[in-house]
């Protein structure tokens, strides 16, 4: 019985891990599906304007759009500036 319990409990843990991973993937996909069509171009243009004035790598800038309510959107811009 102990051997059977071992395998059954492992399947539950594996199933829970798989379920959690799937939930994360679905949440990420929903996050990007809610972005407006103009958002990728907006990111590129913001990055190009910043690069005009500050010499930085593109990975040092993150742009994120969060939806708080149906009528409120928040555009978050994080820039790691060089010394």
UniProtKB/Swiss-Prot annotation:
Keywords: Cell cycle, Cell division. The keyword Chaperone does not apply. One of its GO terms (biological process) is regulation of division septum assembly. Transmembrane segments: none annotated. InterPro entries: MinE, MinE_sf. The keyword Secreted does not apply. Belongs to the MinE family. Prevents the cell division inhibition by proteins MinC and MinD at internal division sites while permitting inhibition at polar sites. This ensures cell division at the proper site by restricting the formation of a division septum at the midpoint of the long axis of the cell. NCBIfam families: minE, PRK00296.1. HAMAP family: MinE. This is Cell division topological specificity factor. It comes from Buchnera aphidicola subsp. Acyrthosiphon pisum (strain APS).
């Amino acid at each position: 019985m102990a051997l059977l319990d071992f395998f059954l409990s492992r399947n539950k843990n594996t199933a829970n891990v798989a379920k959690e991973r799937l939930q994360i993937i679905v949440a990420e996909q929903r996050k990007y599906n809610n972005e407006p069509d103009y958002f990728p171009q907006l990111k590129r243009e913001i990055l190009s304007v910043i690069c005009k004035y500050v010499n930085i790598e593109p990975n040092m800038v993150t742009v994120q759009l969060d939806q708080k309510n149906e009528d409120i959107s928040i555009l978050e811009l994080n820039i790691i500036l060089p010394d």
